[in-house]
């Protein structure tokens, strides 16, 4: 299968000048390949570098060594650890999305504007972007009275749904999920898991961290286990089939 | 994407200077003084690009050279070395440090706009707010009084200056209003690049928030590039996708704003981030 992302001997070590030069190893020598359209689950105990790995791929962290090759449809690739910042901004705008458990709100910007901003960045007309967002608000179950309010005042579940909407609205080809269901109640968790299942059906490539092992097994095609900063083993789990899909969700 | 502006090895020395500090890579000292001759190294080896429509942040402590870099780009501070390539002149990509006086005025009045922390640097306090902005249109060769007035008033509405205050003198404006007039003045001739030198320094937090929102919405609507100088990394985080960190007149780190804040590499950047972010 065509690779979408290839991680080669990736290591991340934090050199903390503010702690007298202390070095903290997040992970070392991780290698794996994510084929196009597959879901790679990442598991491992807290502190074993799962989030750091995803942040290195998004270039929120600088990898210390190794390569992250991100392939396009023509088989060409770009090393995300070395690409110029301006290219990473373009990749984040057009090709790669990242959702963490923490919603990074933009102060004093309404829900509607938060959600359509990625489309405006890609040159969409405002009216078209609003139409697209309105479709998503229905799917994500965001009531109309919240559209023109500030998300900083919302509940955790509402914030997380808006976080995910903002990332999904411009149809990334690679999606990075860092515990998007953490600290959510059952209803919100179900909404988000159903959406991720639907994205899987559409063959979006996904790397996902889920704390709950059942969620992880349900969603993953492959699981990467991080153990003491090293991948212990790679195991195959059966592909999950969606039997009860009620969504008409087009990304 | 091709850069709008490319700054290469910019150097500004205050003082006599010597072969070392005037040379290509001056010896670093414990501060921004040349360890050999004692001249002030305001900036040296400063190299970066600005892309069309982006907001680039420059952070650093007082005296790190942030404002010097803006002054050099705005051609108000004479430099001691380096080049600044700009791509929007009719004659093609030019080193703007070597243009004639007329082109220099065109750059300052039409291609660039600047907003200072101190409104006395950016505004003429002996004419009205309206006059300040209209004057800039006059130097850009607009002559139709009604057209000038209409354009100024429209822009004042955009920057949310109350129409009752258009004709007041800058001394009678609040700090926030002075900054709004400066922003209007910077924008009036549809520049490619706006230089913002601590535009919200000294304002109270609610006014600061409104001015930052205005700058953010203008940069998104008009797709004008900006260089924003601030010592407040939270302000930079709100507006800029890329930042440069300066210390002792040199760039010590640069990168995506979230990367620099979440994974700072240099000792000073780590201290800066850990000092300002809860």
Which residues does each predicted region cover?
Chain B
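Conserved ABC ATPase "signature" region
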Residues: 26-28, 146-164
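Helix-to-loop junction immediately C-terminal to a conserved catalytic motif
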Residues: 74
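ABC ATPase NBD Q-loop/coupling interface
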Residues: 83-106
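Conserved ABC ATPase signature
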Residues: 169-173, 177
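A short, surface-exposed alpha-helical micro-motif characterized by mixed small hydrophobic
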Residues: 236-238
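ABC ATPase "signature
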Residues: 254-255
